[in-house]
Amino acid sequence: KEYKLIWHDCDSFDELKGKDLQQSYGVCFYKDKLVIVSNNGKWSLVGGHIEKGETPEEALTREVQEETNMKVLKQIPIGYQEVINPDGTTIYQLRSFCLVEPLGEFVSDPAGSVTEIKLIDPKDYKKYFNWGKIGDRIMERAIEIPKIVI
């Protein structure tokens, strides 16, 4: 048995109320650059696990500060990944567009595994991570948002 991943575009996470929300990750932009983090030697977006009692927005705000020492100025839902586990249970992994700004110098998170951050041209993301069609859709949505909203 395998994991089944289904991507859903959305502009709000309201439809997921009461569901098993596991992750909140942001496609974070500082000015026109994409913020990525090196986590255990692998580059990825900023984010992580939603703690008990946290909203997805609170979790992402906390993760952004812990991993990058940046502040979230704006958060807009992009969509979510529905993950159907081999045992038939389903969890949800949320993705949002974020505008961020540094609070100060980057300091490696002592409690975490992020050792480096980079600001890259968003079009170059595949040089750092490639998540197939779902990853392409996440990035496509995130890159479009500033043209619409900002």
Predicted feature residues:
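Acidic, metal-coordinating catalytic segment for phosphate/diphosphate chemistry
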Residues: 1-25
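Conserved Nudix-box catalytic region and its N-terminal flanking loop in Nudix hydrolases
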Residues: 29-67
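A short coil-to-beta-strand element that immediately follows conserved catalytic motifs
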Residues: 71-79
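Active-site-adjacent beta-strand/loop module that shapes the phosphate/pyrophosphate-binding cleft
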Residues: 81-105, 118
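Conserved hydrophobic "DFG−1" position in protein kinase catalytic cores
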Residues: 26-28, 119
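Class I (Rossmann-like) S-adenosyl-L-methionine-dependent methyltransferase catalytic domain
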Residues: 12-15, 82-84, 145, 150
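Nudix hydrolase/Nudix homology domain
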Residues: 111-150
